[in-house]
Amino acid sequence: MTLGCSKNLVDTERLMARLESLGYCCAHDPEVATGEIAVINTCGFIGDAKEESINTILQFAERKTQGELKRLYVMGCLAERYRKDLEAEIPEVDKWFGKFDYLNLIEELKTPPQPSPQREGLQAGCQPRVLTTPRHYAYLKISEGCNRMCSYCAIPLITGRHTSVPMEELIREAEWMAGQGVKELNVIAQDLSSYGLDLYKRHQLPELINRLADIEGIGWIRLHYAYPTDFPYPILDVMRERENVCRYLDIALQHATDSMLSTMRRHITRAEQDRLLDTIRTKVPGICLRTTLLVGHPGETEADFRELCDWVEQQQFDRLGAFAYSEEDGTYAAKHYMDDIPEEVKQERVAEIMRIQQAISARKMASQVGKVLRVLTDRREGDYVIGRTEFDSPEVDCEVLITAPSTLGKGEIRIGEFYDIKIERAEEFDLFGKLWSKK
């Protein structure tokens, strides 16, 4: 099972492909992981994620003690950072693997089972990943690590310096995914903006996205986790000119006051952020901007927070998430600042930001009523088929609920297809509509 972000999920999918090439039957489902081997891919980003990871490991350790599992392995960010401590505290785990040595688990499984008849032709390297997402969308991880060293962030301490994946490898992987029926590529990295600087000594994100857009069968390409400093502006031309590159950008801005941006070591000012946002909106009309904010960082005054709230109202982001500061071992903030804001104040600030965003979202969603939007369908729930527009990423954004009684027939809406949907009503984070036509 996988905890944490979509970047972790890609690692799990790669491991599953290697295991299946040896004849193992893998299930990405904790309810199925009984009787044989369990592998937990952990997150170690913030306190809540670490707690979830440890609790999950303990649950599976108990299952092993009860005889429900033969072996238990743990990999990922938590194991990368705290392996020695965890080995002593949770001896039920057979072996721990970090962020970069997890494929050594293959060596640990000395005697693989005999391949089943359906798997006899499957050889190592035949497929790069076992896709655990719905077949019509997948994640393409284009780099590891981060060089930014923001004050609050432990990711560079876990994953190391930014390392781009060679472009040709990414193109081959994306072509393979398209051949599997993937229609939506969610391009992910801790820092999309830096792609190519290490390998090619220049920004190569625009070139990469242009080449991905040429792959037959890819209907949407979505960009996640751009960094505002040293932003690769030519990507905006690609987003405007290429029909299958979504007008959607996930760019984490974190705060809005100069004092907090400096304290957070973001290497950008509010004025520079505002100019960047203006340029993005001018170059890509109608773009959906998603951002993430961090509140309760040491030194955030009430005046800082009020200015942040005013800025959120001013900028009118289409999608927004807010998180409370969590002190992480080894970070600049943990070493140099006192965690001086009470937890209840942090949570109140998160709630207030989200109340502001809820009102913004309600207005923006209401403006879609009466429009016909292109929607990719994800799943069925009762008498609705649930889908998303180009402005919505899987699992984190808004959804479109399409009226679709569960009767078979000529007008049935299929999962994993594009349709034109007439929007009839809206709620704060959801749209409701009916079939207009199949794209």
What are these regions (language model features)?
Residues M1-Y195, P234, L249, A271-T282, ...:
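Proteins enriched for Cys/Gly/acidic motifs involved in redox and nucleic-acid/cofactor modification
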Residues C150, L170, V187, L223, ...:
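Conserved, mostly hydrophobic/aromatic
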Residues A189, Y225, L253-H255, T291-V295, ...:
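Active-site proximal loops enriched in glycine and acidic residues that flank catalytic Cys/His/Asp
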Residues I218, C246-Y248, V284, C288-R290, ...:
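Active-site lining segments that contact anionic ligands and/or coordinate catalytic metals
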